Amino acid sequence: MPDSGTLGTPPPEQGPTPPTTLPDVPAPVIPSASVTSAASDFLAALHPPVTVPDPAPPPPPAPAAGNPPDTVTGDSVLQRILRGPTGPGTTSLAPAVRYGRQPGPEAPASAPPAAGRAVPGLYHHPVPEPDPVRVEEVSRRIKRWAEDEVQLYPEEWEGQFDGFSVGRYMVGCHPDAPTVDHLMLATRLMVAENAVDDCYCEDHGGSPVGLGGRLLLAHTAIDHFHSTAEYTPTWQASLAADAPRRAYDSAMGYFVRAATPSQSDRYRHDMARLHLGYLAEGAWAQTGHVPEVWEYLAMRQFNNFRPCPTITDTVGGYELPADLHARPDMQRVIALAGNATTIVNDLYSYTKELNSPGRHLNLPVVIAEREQLCERDAYLKAVEVHNELQHSFEAAAADLAEACPLPPVLRFLRGVAAWVDGNHDWHRTNTYRYSLPDFW
């Protein structure tokens, strides 16, 4: 693995940078009412109709038009409450209209849909184009942070950093973030998580050999080491030892200053889950073991996107109380969301991983080997697995919304669903990183 410690010295501790070029507007408060409708109405309200043209086949002639109006069919009481609570003490719980247009001057022309083709047969929900003004601002700030504050990458990796399109990614996944500063909380953490994955596990010198020690020491940047006066300074100095640890340390510092203690602790535990999944995958790579399909899926429940959607309340400027987060039915919703959206990554990165050195485990590869299927049939079965997980996530979210229709629960469920949808859209549109196999 390359020695990233030569990329620069650690920056001084800095507080959150206030927005300078983009005025942030609080999320609007929209009227709501009590819950009386069925769970199916929850699903309808989660996913307003959005048309995203498929660029693959030549489209039939159609009149030029802007994006269709964002509407929600039906007039159920639950649909209205999903738009946000009102009354004393509920301002922070009021989400922005999930896919509604934000007030402000209209652009001279609508931005065309981003290139990219969805996996045929994949159950998903189209989303509108992320706000281009926010995308540009988040992209500018995160690059400044990566280069100036944490010296994240050498010059030759700049193209890969830009191709990651993390600004578009995070704006699309957090449509209810009240300000760009809130979006930056998620963006820094996402970049730091990917730096650890790339530099410790995969693309940029990663190796399963010694992975446990590297991950444990990096984790202390998130979950601090508490020791004696003699040894603490050495640990503090170690946080600047390489780019992944510098990124974790800085990103977590910003997050802790914005989050509540319980939100910060939630994130620490979710990152421990992620690192445990990295270790399982690394152990299999080291021994050449191909797990059973269920074993692979169990590993992916830990090595997955879970830490990203579960900070939706912090990024949204509110808190899902710890007791509500700990409910078994909420934990099931979160697990299913993470599992479904991680299989999306397996499907879109399939071709990229086949063309990379070494053998990469993903769901189609494991199904092909363990169930003796050809590559195409294994890939199509993986699509079916994703679809069942996605439907299960939505059904579990609907059941929870009906069982516990508290405003923070409903908003959190909306946020997780928005993250799942935005994550798929980023994979679909990121043609720099992903392309589909020729199975259709």
Swiss-Prot record:
Is the keyword Metal-binding assigned to this protein? yes
Annotated Mg(2+) binding sites: D197, D198, E202, N345, S349, E353
Q: What is this protein called?
A: 2-methylisoborneol synthase
In the record, the note on similarity to other proteins reads: Belongs to the terpene synthase family. 2-methylisoborneol synthase subfamily.
Keyword annotations for this protein, in alphabetical order, are: Lyase, Magnesium, Metal-binding
The EC number(s) this enzyme carries: 4.2.3.118
Q: Could you state one GO biological process linked to this protein? A: terpene metabolic process
Q: Give any extra note attached to this record.
A: 2-MIB is a volatile organic compound that has an unusually low odor threshold. Together with geosmin, methylisoborneol is responsible for the characteristic smell of moist soil as well as unpleasant taste and odor episodes associated with public water supplies and contamination of various foodstuffs, including fish, wine, and beer.
One GO molecular function term? terpene synthase activity
Composition bias type Pro residues, residue spans:
9-29, 50-63
Cofactor(s) essential for the protein: Mg(2+)
- Role played: Catalyzes the cyclization of 2-methylgeranyl diphosphate (2-MeGPP) to 2-methylisoborneol (2-MIB), which likely involves the intermediacy of 2-methyllinalyl diphosphate. Is also able to catalyze the cyclization of geranyl diphosphate (GPP), albeit with much lower efficiency, leading to the formation of a complex mixture of cyclic monoterpenes, consisting of alpha-pinene (6%), beta-pinene (23%), limonene (32%), gamma-terpinene (29%), and delta-terpinene (10%).
Catalyzed reaction equations: (E)-2-methylgeranyl diphosphate + H2O = 2-methylisoborneol + diphosphate
| Positions of the UniProt region annotated as Disordered | 1-33, 46-74
